[in-house]
């Protein structure tokens, strides 16, 4: 005798147009526990949930079964295998389970390969931890400060928002005086290495057209790297300014930039960024940007360590 299919549930959609909460999986199983096959990626694990469980319970069950394999920074859709259609179908948050079934958690795709185009209206600058106490330890610190100031001036000229963080300023001091923070959107203290703080996420949410972040500061292999990975995990395109980014160790810097480039992050220079943002010599701000970049960026030795 053939085994009964894992999921023979029918989906009751008679009142979908009126309310998502009307959707349920209809069956005759009245026990307190319903067997469910939880599928994620190439894996499938049988388990059970209480009768009448909905979206939140299922998400927690996926997390308990698959743990660190699920990147909660991404967006997902929960799908039910419908025997009627012979395939998975999307379910809204209001559905409840009352019969054994097979469900899966599907991550929505994030495009990691990008063309790297920049426009002032879709870009934010992130200045990371350019603080006085780091001056003696960071290689070519004076040079990256000079380039950082060029970027901040360019942001003011082009009307690009700037977010600045300071790592534990109580102990490490504030941003160096050479950097003019006039007009920046936020200056935030932090203890977390990544710049992607709740306040930063809220600020980005207020700028719905933003799709790119230009990132510079210290240290390349710590705060810059973790910020870049957090941003790209949220679907934001990241441009790291190589001539405005450094570490205490050039080996750490080199391997961090190599890793980030492999993950779809764009490694670029300050001049390339500024000219890409104006894009045309007829841009009304081109002359100001041209004057800004006439003084060449320092030949600091960072190039040989990229």
Curated annotation (Swiss-Prot):
InterPro entries linked: Isochorismatase-like_dom, Isochorismatase-like_sf, Isochorismatase_domain
Q: Write down the Pfam families for this protein, in alphabetical order.
A: Isochorismatase (PF00857)
Q: Which SUPFAM superfamilies match?
A: Isochorismatase-like hydrolases
* Gene3D superfamilies linked to this entry: Isochorismatase-like
Task: Look up the record and report any one GO term of the cellular component aspect.
Answer: cytoplasm
Under the heading PANTHER family, the entry gives: HYDROLASE, ISOCHORISMATASE DOMAIN-CONTAINING PROTEIN 1
The UniProt entry's sequence similarity note says:
Belongs to the isochorismatase family.
Q: What is this protein called?
A: Isochorismatase domain-containing protein 1
Organism for this UniProt entry? Xenopus laevis (African clawed frog)
């Amino acid at each position: 005798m053939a085994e009964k299919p894992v999921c023979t549930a029918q989906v009751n959609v008679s009142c979908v147009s009126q309310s998502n909460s009307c959707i349920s999986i209809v069956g005759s199983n009245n026990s307190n526990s319903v067997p469910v096959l939880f599928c994620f990626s190439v894996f499938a694990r049988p388990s059970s949930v209480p009768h009448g469980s909905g979206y939140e319970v299922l998400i927690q069950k996926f997390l308990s079964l698959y743990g660190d394999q699920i990147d909660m920074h991404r967006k997902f859709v929960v799908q039910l295998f419908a025997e009627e259609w012979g395939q998975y179908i999307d379910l809204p948050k209001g559905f409840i389970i009352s019969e054994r079934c097979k469900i899966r958690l599907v991550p929505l795709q994030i495009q990691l390969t990008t063309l790297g185009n920049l426009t002032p209206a879709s870009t934010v600058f992130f200045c990371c931890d350019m603080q006085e106490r780091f001056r003696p330890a960071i290689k070519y610190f004076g040079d990256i400060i000079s380039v950082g100031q060029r970027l901040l001036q360019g942001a003011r000229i082009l009307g690009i928002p700037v977010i600045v963080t300071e790592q534990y300023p109580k102990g490490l001091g504030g941003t160096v005086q050479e950097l003019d923070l006039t007009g920046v959107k936020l200056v935030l203290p932090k203890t977390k290495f990544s710049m992607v703080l709740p306040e930063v996420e809220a600020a980005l949410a207020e700028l719905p057209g933003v799709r790119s972040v230009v990132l510079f500061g210290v240290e390349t292999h710590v705060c810059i790297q973790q910020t870049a990975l957090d941003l790209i995990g949220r679907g934001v395109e990241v441009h790291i300014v190589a001539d405005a980014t450094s570490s205490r160790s050039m080996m750490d810097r080199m391997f961090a930039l190599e890793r980030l480039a492999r993950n779809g992050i764009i490694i670029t220079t300050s001049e390339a960024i500024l000219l890409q943002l104006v894009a045309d010599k007829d841009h009304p701000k081109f002359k100001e940007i041209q004057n800004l970049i006439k003084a060449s960026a320092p030949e600091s030795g960072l190039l040989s360590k990229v």
